[in-house]
Amino acid sequence: MNETRINVDPNEIAKFEQLAHRWWDQEGEFKPLHDINPLRLEYIRNHASLAGKRILDVGCGGGILTEELTRLGAKVTGIDLGKAPLSVARLHALEEGLEIDYQQISVERLAETKAGSFDVITNLEMLEHVPYPASVVAACGQLLKPGGKVFFSTLNRTPKAYLFAVIGAEYALRLLPKGTHDYHRFIRPAELETWCRKGGIELQNLTGLHYNPLTQRYRLGKDINVNYLAYGAKKE
């Protein structure tokens, strides 16, 4: 099985292609991404220096995180397999006067030619949308420089996550379009740690991301049973 060629779900690509024109609408379907972006950025900045670094944003979509990393002085490459989201990302970066290298390529394919090229890799809200997340993690390990850091955010495969992230977020509160997530693709931290270890990455931290429906605000915390962020470092 050649995961480099088939590690993509056409239904997932089609889903985000249809919504691509709404990517920068802060009150639209991607509102949760806009809302959590400051926390994601805070987490990354707390664990890695960014200015002047070469950063790869895997599954960059329309570029919400990518642009902020660029504004902090990093040289950023954003990759995605969706053509429409990348078109939106390129146009928005042009409007903002930002130089970002956007490419329509898989992380596995990029690793074939750019091994050891990046100081920092971000892989946020992406692993749960591909058939073979372990392949993505392995490619991240190949692309990192020794000592480089990789950041993940995904959903834990727990009953609480199903209740909050699927039933609550997609059906009750309608924070996300129905069908955004497939519970069976959620990832337990132990699974992520195993994939990282096999890829030469030492996982160093897990932090929960919590949503309060009463205040409609997000915060970082200790509970990793629903959404969580993680970072690891490639062995020197």
Swiss-Prot record:
The protein's Enzyme Commission number: 2.1.1.222, 2.1.1.64
GO molecular function: 2-polyprenyl-6-hydroxyphenol methylase activity; 3-demethylubiquinol 3-O-methyltransferase activity; polyprenyldihydroxybenzoate methyltransferase activity
Domain of life: Bacteria
Sequence positions that bind S-adenosyl-L-methionine: 40, 59, 80, 124
Keywords on record: Methyltransferase, S-adenosyl-L-methionine, Transferase, Ubiquinone biosynthesis
Catalytic activity from the UniProt record: a 3-demethylubiquinol + S-adenosyl-L-methionine = a ubiquinol + S-adenosyl-L-homocysteine + H(+); a 3-(all-trans-polyprenyl)benzene-1,2-diol + S-adenosyl-L-methionine = a 2-methoxy-6-(all-trans-polyprenyl)phenol + S-adenosyl-L-homocysteine + H(+)
Pfam families reported in the protein's UniProt record: Methyltransf_11 (PF08241)
Protein's pathway: Cofactor biosynthesis; ubiquinone biosynthesis
Biological processes per GO annotation: methylation
UniProt similarity note: Belongs to the methyltransferase superfamily. UbiG/COQ3 family.
Its biological purpose: O-methyltransferase that catalyzes the 2 O-methylation steps in the ubiquinone biosynthetic pathway.
UniProt protein name: Ubiquinone biosynthesis O-methyltransferase
Organism listed in the record: Nitrosococcus oceani (strain ATCC 19707 / BCRC 17464 / JCM 30415 / NCIMB 11848 / C-107)
Phylogenetic classification of the source organism: Bacteria, Pseudomonadati, Pseudomonadota, Gammaproteobacteria, Chromatiales
Name of the gene encoding the protein in the UniProt record: ubiG
